[in-house]
Structures are given as C-alpha cells and as structure tokens.
Amino acid sequence: MTAALRARGWTVHPCGQDTYPPAVRDALRQTRSALRQFPDLIAARGGDLVTIDAKDRMPSTDTDRYAISTDTVNAGLLFTAAHAPTPLYYVFGDLKVLTPAEVIHYTAHALRHRSGAFHLVHTEQAHYFDDVFGSAGAAAAA
C-alpha cells in the first residue's frame, strides 16, 4: 500500500500502533481506547493530507464483503470529526477504499454481522484506489 501511494506521488509516513514499542502495543491491546484504532499511515501530496487505516488482511476474496469492526468505525468517525478536514480512508487488501461515514451509510439498513460487532459492506460499494489517490501513470507524468 505504501509503495502504491508513493507511485502516485504521495509522501507516506507510518503512524499508529505499529510505530509504538512493544510495551505500549501490549497496553493498548488491554484497553478499549480509540487509540487502538489510530490510522496506520499519514500521507501528503502537494497541499493534500490524508490518513489511512490499512485493512490489508481483509481482501474479501470469499464473500465479496468487507467486515469492519464496529469499534473501528466508531473510532474512525471520532477521528474524522476531531481532525477535519483531513480525511480517513480504509484501504483494503484489494486496494479498494471506503471512509468511516460510507461504512455507516452502506450498512444503516443493510447487512450486519449477526453479533452486531461488524459492519458488512459489499466490495462493489468501495472506490477504486486510483479514483481516490490518483493513478501511478499520472504521478509519473507530473
């Protein structure tokens, strides 16, 4: 995902749990804090700034649906509100993209996991990576 963004002219930097020392990650696992859901990447291109929560282990190859935890979506909505106008994007393993608000919109009257712990969104609802972040060819030509 980082390579795909860089190929489109974005400067990318890691953030979130993967950047913390093991003791901090362990402590976060034991809490319900929204910090557990902090975005994985921050990226800039020109004057544009975005944050990305990488969902690369969720390609939805079997069901044609993404399962996004309710905790993740709730934290994403809070993050988006606190850091507006900087968007937060969920980028999935198949490089398709949704925002927290879109997850809520597409699941308000639709498929929900029977436990209520996940929002299930059809992959066809997601945006193509190039539509959100630009194409690699356009970045090379610029």
Residue ranges and their predicted role:
Residues 39-60:
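Conserved catalytic cores of phosphodiester-cleaving nucleases, focusing on short active-site segments
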